[in-house]
């Protein structure tokens, strides 16, 4: 599947948000790249909406065409379109693996899923965009559990803080999805209403 593979720090600086998680280079220079990076530029309404859409795309590692499909589905669902969109993105398998503490970044989680290291409800899933459901059980494949990465992750999971809608069992590297997240439980710096306004034009 196509995905953005360019310099993450530069993209973070342009959108003024840490897209990676723990990006020290961004923390040192949290302003857009280039000579005019520190300058305060008057931003149009359209630019703000576009930036928010791009921010969501790059946080979750979603290409434009797929993101548009997410929005269309979110718009068809009952409730607030923006909140529906964020919940759908947060429910991606790669994001759940990241939130559970089995990967340092969403990009790494996407790679781990793509390489076939996880099973959902007993069935192998290697699609990062696979959306989990309430009561799903996610396990690391038995062969994969012997990898150095998962052995190290297992030690770190004991003290890991995970979202309330998930539960992690460190001894078995199991993730339990107690419920789908509510918007208030999703701690990303995103103004999803601006995305709704962008697509409503």
UniProtKB/Swiss-Prot annotation:
It comes from the Bacteria. Gene3D superfamilies: Ribosomal Protein S4 Delta 41, Chain A, domain 1, RNA-binding S4 domain. Part of the 30S ribosomal subunit. Contacts protein S5. The interaction surface between S4 and S5 is involved in control of translational fidelity. Residues 91-151 form the S4 RNA-binding domain. GO terms for biological process: ribosomal small subunit biogenesis; translation. One of the primary rRNA binding proteins, it binds directly to 16S rRNA where it nucleates assembly of the body of the 30S subunit. Pfam families: Ribosomal_S4, S4. PROSITE patterns: RIBOSOMAL_S4, S4. Belongs to the universal ribosomal protein uS4 family. SUPFAM superfamilies: Alpha-L RNA-binding motif. GO terms for molecular function: rRNA binding; structural constituent of ribosome. This is Small ribosomal subunit protein uS4. It comes from Corynebacterium efficiens (strain DSM 44549 / YS-314 / AJ 12310 / JCM 11189 / NBRC 100395). Keywords: Ribonucleoprotein, Ribosomal protein, RNA-binding, rRNA-binding. One of its GO terms (cellular component) is small ribosomal subunit.
């Amino acid at each position: 599947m196509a995905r953005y593979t360019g310099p993450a720090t530069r993209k973070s600086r342009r959108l003024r948000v840490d897209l990676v998680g723990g990006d020290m280079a961004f923390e040192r220079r949290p302003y857009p790249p280039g000579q005019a990076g520190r300058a305060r530029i008057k931003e149009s309404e359209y630019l703000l909406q576009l930036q928010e859409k791009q921010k969501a795309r790059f946080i979750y590692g979603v290409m434009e065409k797929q993101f548009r499909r997410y929005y269309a589905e979110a718009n068809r669902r009952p409730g607030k379109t923006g909140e529906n969109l964020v919940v759908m993105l947060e429910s991606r398998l790669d994001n759940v693996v990241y939130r559970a503490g089995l990967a340092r970044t969403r990009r790494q989680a996407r790679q781990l899923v793509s390489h076939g290291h996880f099973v959902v409800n007993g069935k192998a899933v290697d699609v990062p965009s696979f959306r989990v459901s309430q009561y799903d059980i996610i396990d690391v494949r038995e062969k994969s559990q012997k990898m150095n990465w998962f052995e190290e992750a297992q030690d770190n999971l004991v003290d890991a803080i995970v979202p309330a809608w998930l539960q992690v069992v460190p001894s078995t590297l199991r993730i339990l999805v107690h419920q789908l997240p509510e918007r208030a439980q999703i701690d990303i710096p995103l103004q999803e209403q601006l995305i709704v306004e962008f697509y409503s034009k």
